[in-house]
Amino acid sequence: MRVVILGSGVVGVTSAWYLAKEGHDVTVIDRQDGPAQETSAGNAGQISPGYAAPWAAPGVPLKAIKWMFQRHAPLAIRLDGSSLQLRWMWQMLRNCDTSHYMVNKSRMVRLAEYSRDCLKDLRAATGIQYEGRQGGTLQLFRTEQQFDNAAKDIAVLDDAGVPYSLLTAEQLATVEPALAKVAHKLTGGLRLPNDETGDCKLFTERLAKMAEQAGVKFIFNRSVDKLLVEGDQIAGVLCGDDIIKADAYVVAFGAYSTALLAGLVSIPVYPLKGYSLTIPITDPASAPFSTVLDETYKIAITRFDDRIRVGGMAEIVGFNTQLAPARRETLEMVVRDLYPHGGDISQAVFWSGLRPMTPDGTPIVGRTPLKNLYLNTGHGTLGWTMACGSGQLLADIIQGRRPAIVADDLSVARYRTGFQPLNIAPLHDIHPIR
């Protein structure tokens, strides 16, 4: 079968890889000059199924108001009056109750755990190298309330079968030695030993080369103007003066998927702007061993081979990708506070990207009402975490094979009035880990 994939970020390239392994004739189209040039280029580097959770959570609306007056707030909103932004924010607000949160988190953890397993299998089969580490993740708490809330909320990890350990401030240095010097600033941490890290851009570039060797064709520097429809299916992709035809089409366009699908399939995917710094390491012993997540500022600090990646924050500002100096100050403040001697911040590379976020936090993977059109988008801040599982899942669906995990509630059909998912045991009715 001929399959066209629109988008060459980590989600598009993993989709191409798994479809090619099934024997399909795959073509990937992207406006950039190579893979992983946008959202996949500078993310925080975490592969963290245990922390997979929607931003739409109980308490977030009130926190958002409080954050408006904080210099280093993890979330910022700039209203532009567009119907897309207002509608998406309203949909997100409707998901900020406990019942919605638990359903959404259950979906996300299910896919994220599966995706990590798929990544392990891919790594074993190909030997792909991407500065990956399997050293777990560590969520850091600065207040007693954060620590106490985590102690109450770990039942969500028990339900998902995720191993964890709750550490006191004195125990943090056993997994992150450099934190010994700043333990007095912290109250403890939650460690997830099965989580991983790695350079998403490097992984995507190298997997794209492997996919090309497996027969995948990549068309770069080509804008995608329109999906052409005939009857109940896609007839081709209009790229300038050319029409590219296939038997099946996959939209993996990230935050730009919504506009491309306008008038064909309605999806609530909106850009959530994030930032990162990439810092050269000057003292390996003073740098992170794996990765930490500062719970107060929602910022991750991740170790690559000879670099530190500091990433996080969220801005609801439309498609604005301008670099905000105030956001750089926040990233620098956090890394200086926790790892003051790890790297040369004066040599840091500052980056911003647009994560494709759904209001319920769960990506959209699977079929659409158009019989040969498939979606793999809306992964938000977890594209790297969920990419391999989403790619394998999509390949199974296109292949007509039953997926290894329940997937009906991951498709766009879940937004349809009256949608009833398969019977899945919910997570405990508890407060979210935030």
UniProtKB/Swiss-Prot annotation:
Q: Which organism is it from?
A: Yersinia pseudotuberculosis serotype O:3 (strain YPIII)
Report which reactions are catalysed by this protein. a D-alpha-amino acid + A + H2O = a 2-oxocarboxylate + AH2 + NH4(+)
Could you tell me the gene encoding this protein? dadA
NCBIfam families according to UniProt: PRK00711.1
* Protein name as it appears in the record: D-amino acid dehydrogenase
Any one Gene Ontology BP term: D-alanine catabolic process
Which cofactor is recorded for it?
Answer: FAD
Q: What Enzyme Commission number(s) does the record list for this chain?
A: 1.4.99.-
Q: Does the keyword Oxidoreductase apply?
A: yes
